[in-house]
Amino acid sequence: MSETKRVIDLTVRMAQRSISSEFKGTALGRLWSFINPIATIAVYALIFGVVFRGEADKGANSGLSSFALWIGVGVIAWNFMSSGIQRGMDSLVGNSGLLTKVYFPRQVLIYSSVLALAYDFAFELGVIILIMCIAGGPGVLLMIPAVIVITLLAMLFVIGMGLILSVASVYFRDISHLWQIFNQIWMYASGVVFSLSMLNKVQTDLAAKGWTWGGEPLPIVTIFRLNPAELFLEAYRSTLYGFAMPSWQVWLGCVAWAFGIFGLGSLIFRRFSARIVEEL
């Protein structure tokens, strides 16, 4: 069996084992995959929609103008990416006993953790698509192929981040704690709870008050859109909430970040993987 086939086989088998054990012993089992996203959306919609009176952009083709649905798409997409990176980062340290006893391609641990999470994410996307069908019509069904491509790109990005951070956490155990702090900041910097139009308004208001850079408004929106997580969230919202294809700039950004980070992560992992067991 070639190395590539072995990696794929081990990845699938380990992901299946993780999936089968995830809800083992719970009364509701796989139903939690449907309950969790709905509950999460309800909480965020209540806090940021009702209490803080958040506003959502109007869907391009769907005509939807619901903050609950808008933030719902962002929350489940963010949770997938954030949880995937966290799981990938913890894969090596969390399986140190296995790594010191059995030899197998180390990257399989990161691949399988993200693949198992993607399985749950597929259920959550199904819930969102069903809700969007009810709220905005069947137009969202035409976006499913695009959503699949976006998810595959997001998986590449998440795996790449997992590869980088998993190696870093082996050599520097504080990385896991630092990441939890950074992750909170990153969430709010990715537009999970506020729209691009709200940010544009802030930029315009600041310019009106004299906050400029070389006579031009502060490049808040430009910097904001360099954030890879924001690009993926924008792509998901465009398709699932707006029933429209993302702009070519968003597509280009998602592809560049996905393959760039995955490639970088693979290089770093390959460079340091030989010494992982020694450090563990």
What are these regions, as identified by a protein language model?
Residues 1-280:
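Hydrophobic transmembrane alpha-helices and immediately adjacent juxtamembrane helices
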